[in-house]
Amino acid sequence: KIMSSLEAKHPGESEYLQAVKEVLLSIEDIYNQHPEFEKAKIIERLVEPDRIFTFRVTWVDDKGEVQTNLGYRVQFNNAIGPYKGGIRFHASVNLSILKFLGFEQTFKNALTTLPMGGGKGGSDFSPRGKSDAEIMRFCQAFMLELWRHLGPDMDVPAGDIGVGGREVGYMFGMYKKLTREFTGTFTGKGLEFGGSLIRPEATGFGGLYFVNQMLQTKGIDIKGKTVAISGFGNVAWGAATKAT
């Protein structure tokens, strides 16, 4: 019933609908044992984002030509804390993907036991093949539209695919200029302006810690094992460093 309603409301959003379906199937037995959950419409409230911002990002490339992209911020759930989730810059970005990521980010952040909600944002802008100046102008234009919806007690973005320390720095710089505040509104910043010492390695290290815990539940020691890693981006290099 819940999935049928979602499919009717959000046709074509395959990534988002698949993520919701997988979660619902995993909690079905427990949910059915608690009729009070259904009475309070817990699932219906959990699977829909609190709000979504969609906006045009207009910027000028190195040839002096005006370019336009779409920007998004999905503030999915802040039941236990401010919205928290990365910003992704990639040509494949669309609302369905960001809703799926924001939905799963809610659970991911809850598992940390820290007071963080779930959110996700991004744009169909691709940094690949762009100059530093073009990326800076895009990040500033992106933040010009989004800044009023962010804050340390409201929504705290981070990096993601296509968004590293450089891009976070450009966006945070614009945010500071617009708000006239130096607050903890972004994570993933450079060390020079408030970043964490081990942030670059954190995701890759965490992946290895997770794999090690999985193996330990089966009585297997990770020492001496061969680790296969695909790619060599923000996550892979940290995982490779920890694996060696």
Model-derived features with residue positions:
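N-terminal Rossmann-fold NAD(P) dinucleotide-binding loop
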Residues: A236-W237
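N-terminal cap/recognition module
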Residues: E65-T106
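Structured beta-strand/loop patches that form or line metal/cofactor-binding pockets in enzymes
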Residues: E36-E65
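Glycine-rich Rossmann-fold phosphate-binding loop(s) that bind the pyrophosphate
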Residues: F232
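Aromatic pocket-lining residues of Rossmann-like dinucleotide-binding sites
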Residues: A243
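Hydrophobic Val/Ile/Leu positions in short beta-strands of Rossmann-like dinucleotide-binding domains
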Residues: V227-I229
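Glycine/serine-rich phosphate-binding loop and adjoining beta1-alpha1 elements at the start
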Residues: H90, N109-K223
